[in-house]
Amino acid sequence: MTIAVGRAPSRGWFDVLDDWLKRDRFVFVGWSGILLFPCAFLALGGWLTGTTFVTSWYTHGLASSYLEGANFLTVAVSTPADSMGHSLLLLWGPEAQGDLTRWFQLGGLWPFVALHGAFGLIGFMLRQFEIARLVGIRPYNALAFSAPIAVFVSVFLMYPLGQSSWFFAPSFGVAAIFRFLLFLQGFHNWTLNPFHMMGVAGVLGGALLCAIHGATVENTLFEDGDGANTFRAFNPTQSEETYSMVTANRFWSQIFGIAFSNKRWLHFFMLFVPVTGLWMSAVGIVGLALNLRAYDFVSQELRAAEDPEFETFYTKNILLNEGIRAWMAPQDQPHEQFVFPEEVLPRGNAL
């Protein structure tokens, strides 16, 4: 009889940390959690701090906090002043010099929230990658979540990087986002941009597909239980599918003449439409950062200028855009001291 005596191989600190991070718990941490949880906490905490008591008087000449009388729809963490350029406005940097009050006044919370928010979103996408790998499924959830990340990064970071300063990014607030949308329309004619059109088609098309898919599945559910409603009538461990793909295929074949032939193609299409739309809108925003123009119908503008009786919806929208610029520039950028003489203000052909 032979007895072998040996030592268990020693485990390094990396293996110990890896086991602890991936331990089965109520809220999974994982390696992605090292990025996600601190960044999400700091971004949300910075936004709540700014909207509670930090003013935008020094950066925009506005009241933007609950302390100043704003409400949930009008509070915001505002962008720094135009004069700050693209400075990260670190608390210990040359602008604030470690003074927390001065840091708030200069708009230092905005880059703080924007950068931690971006890394928090990336951490959440990596979390979906990590958990998908651990449970043995494909990582398409993470791929889908890349679309809103692309929109966030393009709007809040890449667009102002293409402009003169962070000042031209959207502030973090509901009414502030609306102001930014008006800005994009007035200065970039964004609604006529083909990338915006693809984004709208993707988002609304995705919503339509989601509604149609949910209704079709509900219509073709098998009645395999005696529960009082849909949510009690099915056993979550049943081996067979809960709805009839064949019946759904026959229904839509009669409605449109065509239908999805299998579930894989159907669900890939539901993934493809909104994700592609959001990615295209993000590409369009990068184009706006570079001040690229799209769909300027100059021939119509020239004819409208020469012929008082000629006007199209396009030329009318161009006049509206000029009105937005003439109104918004002095209001939104008072530091530039813009003065527009009466004769340059836009007027429709009917006036």
Curated annotation (Swiss-Prot):
UniProt catalytic activity: 2 a plastoquinone + 4 hnu + 2 H2O = 2 a plastoquinol + O2
Gene name as annotated: psbD1
Coiled-coil regions, chain positions: none
PROSITE patterns according to UniProt: REACTION_CENTER
Ligand binding (pheophytin a): 128, 141
Family to which this protein belongs: Belongs to the reaction center PufL/M/PsbA/D family.
Record-listed chlorophyll a ChlzD2 binding positions: 116
Designated name of the protein: Photosystem II D2 protein
HAMAP family in the cross-refs: PSII_PsbD_D2 (MF_01383)
GO CC aspect terms: photosystem II; plasma membrane-derived thylakoid membrane
